[in-house]
Every structure is written in structure tokens, then in C-alpha cells.
Amino acid sequence: MIQVQTELLVADNTGAKRIECIKVLGGSKRRYASIGDTIVIAVKEALPKGKVKKGSVHKAVVVRVKKGIHREDGSKVRFDNNAAVLVDDKGEPVGTRIFGPVTRELRSRGQMKIISLAPEVL
């Protein structure tokens, strides 16, 4: 569960290391985002030669959450950290590589490009 002011790690090679959620997209009263949801973020920490700079505002798709998600078969998938992948306005990933595992639920959310770049799909 990601809400405003939640800090996340970045799971791609855009150069950003740490980001902060500043808005959850999908309705004016929407409070929380989970895996596959799009959020608006501010870059809090970045590499000097990266594609994004500290303080810049972008959109991102959440790919891992500590809270975990329940599946139809009764299993629960949870991770050690909250992580997101930066995307452009069309929803395409800004980076060319993705680090760490992602979940199958991204497929039903229409994030096929992220799944194809990921090294492991749980």
C-alpha cells in the first residue's frame, strides 16, 4: 500500500535511486496504490549522470510492495521493499532495464513492457 509521502526504491536504470509518492492517480479521493497502479513521484536521490535529476517530477508504476497482495488461489506475495519503475506519459518505461522480480498482476494491468524487461516474474 503506497500513499502520499511514501518513499520507494527505483527498480530500473534511469539513474534515480529513491523517490517519493506525491499523488496516487485514479480518482480525486483515492488514497492508496498497490502493484500495477500509476503514481506521480518526485525524485529524492539520483545518480549524477542519470536520465532523471533530483527534484524532477515523473509518473511511475508500482512493481513491489511490502504489504503484499492476495491471489485467487489463496496465496500471498510480499516483498522486502516498496519499488516502482519510472514511465513516461504514454505509460512506456523510461529505463531500458528492470532490476528485481515483478508480479504477474502487472499483466492484467496492461504493463506488458515492464514484464518483458523484468528478469523474474512471480
Curated annotation (Swiss-Prot):
SMART domains per record: Ribosomal_L14
Q: Which PANTHER family match?
A: 50S/60S RIBOSOMAL PROTEIN L14/L23, LARGE RIBOSOMAL SUBUNIT PROTEIN UL14M
Q: Source gene?
A: rplN
A Gene Ontology biological process in which this protein takes part is: translation
> Which NCBIfam families does this UniProt record tie to the protein?
rplN_bact
* Function summary: Binds to 23S rRNA. Forms part of two intersubunit bridges in the 70S ribosome.
What Pfam families would the database entry show?
Answer: Ribosomal_L14
Q: What are the record keywords, sorted?
A: Ribonucleoprotein, Ribosomal protein, RNA-binding, rRNA-binding
UniProt-recorded name of the protein:
Large ribosomal subunit protein uL14
What organism, scientifically named, is this protein from? Pelagibacter ubique (strain HTCC1062)
- Transferase as a keyword of this entry, yes or no, is no
**Highest taxon listed in the record's lineage:** Bacteria
What family does the entry list?
Belongs to the universal ribosomal protein uL14 family.
| CDD domains, sorted | Ribosomal_uL14
Q: Does the keyword Oxidoreductase apply?
A: no
| Extent of the signal sequence | none
- Which cellular component terms (GO) are annotated to the entry? cytosolic large ribosomal subunit
PROSITE patterns linked to this entry: RIBOSOMAL_L14 (PS00049)
User: Partners and quaternary state?
Assistant: Part of the 50S ribosomal subunit. Forms a cluster with proteins L3 and L19. In the 70S ribosome, L14 and L19 interact and together make contacts with the 16S rRNA in bridges B5 and B8.
**What's one GO MF term for it?**
large ribosomal subunit rRNA binding
